[in-house]
Amino acid sequence: MSKVFLATIATSIDDALAYVMQAAGMPESVTGKSVLIKPNLFEPVSYTTGQTTNPALVKAVVQWCQQHNAQEVIVGEGPSYFTPAGALKGCFTKTGIAEVVERCGSTWILFDEHDYRTYHDTSPLLPQLFRISEHAFLYDILINLPVPKTHYLTTVSIGMKNLKGFLKREDKPLFHRADINKAVVELNKIITPFINLVDFTTTRHHRSGFIAAGSDIVATDSVSTALMGLNPHEIQTLTLGSQAGLGEIDLAKIEIVGEDSKGLKMHYELPAAWLEKHFPLLTITGHDTACSGCTIPLFSSLTQLADQGKTFTRPLTLMLGTATRASDAPDCLMIGDCSPKKPENCQRVGGCPPSKHEILKTLSEHV
């Protein structure tokens, strides 16, 4: 039976981590071994947004591995395709990760600066050609350190999706143009973390914060999804992952060890509800015909506005993909180049993909 270990931050992150690592039998596993820690640092934003891994947890994991005589401990990530090339290192420096790793006497690496392994015709569910960082395969132990989030394409983004950070930056959009849920499952057949530590440490959704841990990535993501207030069986990456033999999705067949999960349940807003709450005057059309080239920089820009407490003061219609029908709203904005036809009352932020900076700049004119 798969096991998932839960520990609240009652006294310190260090104590909670020590509990789940001990319960999972990790002390004997890391001794004398090389370890790669893979957090989620897709953008240079603070962990307090709930979008990137808490540097305090990264520090705790690095120190725990060092204290248990790991031969080498490295922290590595490959940020989002939509993070400008000049800002990639900022995903380490501006998030506080670089500082804590260096203080521990360890090393952080940007995958983009190192070698990649090329895959050709691996699966009909994957892009014909894509590249994975060699660092996914160089270490004895891979510790996956995701942040639990909702996502407009996969509903949730936890451990399974966090492995996309190993892809070469230019190849990441290819996974979105394919069926992303199936592609993520196929990627998880290639890269296998030794343990997954889900970072629920920010108090954004729970009063105390906690850690969920497990070696079964589907089981760990399934329990985490349930704790987010969502049904694992409604998440395609989890149902497909279970069917592919990657792990257990049935909560009745997963042993939860440690904290009582009933006291940890939260309510994460799905993207549609989040948009209605923060931008009630916003209408988005054509999103079902748009790829991530438009949707990722758009939702990232909207998140940035929401975090600043900003909203639109009058109705605004955003048109994506091949949507070209006219809008009754006094303000209309087209995103991307998919549709050659632009209604008379619309602005356009063009490009394939369009610039996040330009999208944010244009949206800011309407708040």
Segments and roles (model prediction):
Residues M1-V367:
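N-terminal and secondary-structure boundary signal
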